Regions:
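Pyridoxal 5′-phosphate
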Residues: 1-237
Length: 237
């Protein structure tokens, strides 16, 4: 079989990934929830993964790396942290439903930076014209349908100059193109683990440039006495 559906999920995973997953299932359990050997082993794996991700995406504070169930989970956290009913949100014309549906469900006022298809200069002009009226910008790095690469570093710079928070959907670019947290200055960067990072299904990353609001509440494995989630990252999320 010749597999061409890598934009949805990469397959077959590298042998090293399969070995690491098998090893973790046999030796590790309950990271951050105990002092026994399996818990400490699991915690070490999580910390090492967080440090590796922070190095790959140029995040100087590893605690800003929050692990999620997938990119949809990460995007929902990011969007619901910064948008609400009536928020003026600017998006590209290439967004995934994981961006547009949460915004629609919230009742955000969505505007599209539209241009001729695959017109880099036209897209930049559309964003330049519309960012001043926006309260939030959400943009994909690469279209999952067309493979078109959007000029997100330039868009992020426009947002920074205008004081508008920027969320990047790096679902199709993480592991393929450079995703530089410090250069982007994004409020949030979301990505899955199961695409070009060659991880398993059910994994994702949210890089938190600002404080977010937890989408789910429950056991954090630390600071368990308060009724609310801890205030510090990554446990807060």
């Amino acid at each position: 079989m010749i597999y061409l559906d890598n934009a949805a999920t990469t397959m077959i995973k590298p042998e090293a990934v399969a070995r690491a997953m098998t090893d973790a299932m046999r030796r590790a359990a309950s990271p951050g929830r105990g002092g026994h050997v399996p818990a400490m082993t699991a915690a070490e794996i999580v910390y090492r993964c967080r440090e590796n991700a922070s190095e790959l995406f140029n995040v100087p504070e590893p605690e800003r790396i929050v692990f999620t169930m997938n990119a949809t989970h990460a995007l929902n956290i990011a969007i619901r942290s910064l948008a609400h009913k009536g928020t003026r949100v600017l998006v590209s014309g290439y967004e995934h439903n994981s961006v547009t549906r949460p915004l629609a469900q919230l009742g955000a006022d969505i505007a599209v930076a539209s241009s001729a298809p695959f017109d880099r200069n036209g897209i930049l002009k559309a964003f330049r014209d519309k960012i001043p009226a926006a309260e939030l910008v959400v943009c994909t790095h690469v279209s999952n349908v067309f493979g078109f690469i959007l000029p997100v570093y330039e868009i992020a710079d426009m947002c920074r100059r205008a004081g508008v928070p920027f969320i990047l959907d790096a679902s199709q670019s993480a592991g393929v193109l450079e995703v530089d947290y410090q250069a982007l200055g994004a409020a949030f960067i979301a990505m899955p683990g199961h695409k070009a990072l060659f991880g398993p299904q059910g994994t994702g990353i949210l890089i938190c440039g600002v404080e977010g609001e937890p989408l789910l509440s429950g056991g954090s494995g630390s600071d368990s006495i308060p009724q609310l989630m801890p205030e510090y990252l990554p446990d807060r999320m």
